[in-house]
């Protein structure tokens, strides 16, 4: 496991993410120490903060929050502790208050710590370029701090910046060739690039370095699943749970793997266990959405409707508005009736604005997905004026942000609308900017077919057929594609 975006947009994305890799313009004074210092008056708080970082690297994603909460209780002025609570918590109210506390204390910190706080806070507040610049300056100040290189690379992977992340992991491993956290994430980058032999070799090293930790087994299970080796995946997830029965992400992994294998009944059994032992409310809701998706995979849409509606209601009651919005969006994505889908997408948008505690970055990313779906639905129903309206709103969101997720939503939506207009040549460059999405890949295959680009068609179709990720897009596109004869 690892800690799981106009015409000018391509250039904007390239610019923003190119800034993520250290540029070494030498405009930032190097730190006096090799590693980033931590300002605190309490040795116990420092130990707890460092334990939190160790737990974070080993993917104990709720335990590290508990460590950091204990650290700031020992020293309420531990700004970087507050910053990482804001970064990693799943509680919107806690995220908002912790970020405010970190920013309030920032003036008392060293320059490097100030950059760390700025990176986290600016990104969450929607200033993507400002956050990347702060992160980049932090890395330039402490170029041999392997932990900072990992933290930055791990975040970049979540923003689809795989190439930039890979360079950071490789640099971290040049400092310490046996650094487990970087080795783990580098394997994920290789797997995303379909270089599974390299990824599996890294996993063997990762397990050897941390034989008593569950995450190496969990990661190996996920990468094997990505490659299509489901039985091998199940073995490693079970091995992780044997090492730590409370490593709930491996329990979730069993459910996800059975779902991809087509055994939805067993998937629900495994998901129920994950839901029961979830460490926080946000995770419990997310696992419940995965369970509801099994009914979509079975074609039991009435039961799926019921499941997602119940999750949305629970999320609303628990003030988990992001998960409420996600539930309504998923409910819309598999509907055959465009008006029903549109109704649920409207509810998804409303959920994002029930309270102001959702971070701007989370709100904007989810809104970009909602707008993408609305543009596609409008185009599908033949309402080109409405499709253009939704696309223009998404374009405005993309032009105001360097966020790669938002940029991808825009390109995917633009390409979808162009495909509906039979503008295949114009659609291709837009779709190619979002080619990891099964919805987009399906359209890209059609566009290559219509423009007689046979080699690219085969490449895109092979990639589409090989996608083994437990997402709604995969559920709606990939099994149906596999059931059809390949093009040409």
Stretch-by-stretch model annotation:
Residues 41-70, 74, 114-133, 137, ...:
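Alpha-helical segment of the N-proximal tetratricopeptide repeat
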């Amino acid at each position: 496991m690892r800690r799981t975006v106009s015409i000018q947009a391509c250039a904007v994305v390239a610019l923003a993410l190119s800034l993520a890799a250290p540029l070494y313009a030498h405009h930032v004074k190097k730190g006096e120490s090799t590693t980033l210092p931590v300002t605190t008056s309490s040795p116990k708080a420092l130990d707890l903060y460092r334990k939190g970082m160790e737990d974070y690297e080993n993917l104990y994603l709720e335990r590290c929050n508990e460590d950091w909460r204990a650290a700031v209780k020992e020293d309420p002025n531990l700004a970087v502790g507050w910053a990482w609570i804001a970064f990693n918590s799943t509680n919107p109210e806690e995220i908002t208050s912790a970020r405010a506390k970190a920013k309030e204390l920032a003036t008392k910190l060293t320059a490097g710590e100030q950059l760390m706080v700025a990176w986290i806070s600016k990104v969450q507040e929607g200033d993507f370029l400002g956050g990347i610049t702060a992160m980049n300056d932090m890395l330039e100040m402490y170029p041999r701090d392997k932990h900072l290189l990992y933290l930055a690379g791990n975040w970049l992977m979540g923003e689809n910046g795989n190439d930039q992340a890979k360079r950071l992991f490789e640099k971290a491993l040049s400092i310490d060739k046996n650094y487990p956290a970087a080795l783990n994430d580098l394997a994920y980058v290789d797997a995303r690039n379909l270089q599974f032999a390299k990824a599996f070799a890294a996993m063997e090293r990762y397990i050897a370095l941390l034989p008593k930790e569950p995450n190496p087994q969990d990661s190996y299970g996920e990468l094997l699943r990505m490659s299509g080796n489901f039985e091998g995946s199940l073995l490693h997830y079970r091995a992780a749970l044997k090492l730590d029965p409370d490593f709930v992400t491996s329990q979730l992994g069993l459910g996800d793997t059975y779902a991809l294998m087509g055994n939805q009944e067993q998937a629900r059994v495994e998901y129920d266990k994950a839901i029961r032992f979830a460490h926080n409310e946000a995770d419990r809701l997310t696992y419940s959405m995965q369970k509801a998706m099994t009914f979509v995979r079975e074609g039991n849409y009435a039961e799926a409707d019921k499941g997602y509606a119940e999750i949305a209601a629970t999320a609303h009651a628990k003030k988990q508005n992001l998960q409420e919005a996600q539930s309504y969006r998923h409910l819309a994505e598999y509907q055959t009736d465009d008006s029903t889908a549109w109704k649920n997408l409207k509810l998804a948008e409303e959920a994002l604005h029930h309270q102001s505690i959702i971070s701007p970055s989370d709100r904007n990313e989810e809104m970009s997905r909602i707008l993408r779906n609305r543009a596609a639905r409008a185009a599908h129903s033949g309402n080109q004026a409405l499709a253009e309206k939704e696309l223009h709103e998404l374009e405005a969101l993309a032009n105001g942000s360097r966020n790669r997720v938002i940029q991808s939503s825009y390109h995917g939506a633009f390409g979808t609308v162009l495909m509906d207009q039979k503008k295949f040549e114009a659609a291709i460059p837009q779709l190619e900017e979002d080619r990891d999405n099964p919805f987009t890949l399906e359209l890209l295959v059609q566009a290559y077919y219509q423009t007689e680009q046979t080699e690219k068609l085969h490449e895109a179709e092979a990639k589409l057929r090989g996608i083994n990720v437990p997402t709604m897009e995969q559920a709606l596109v990939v099994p149906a594609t596999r059931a059809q004869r390949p093009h040409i």
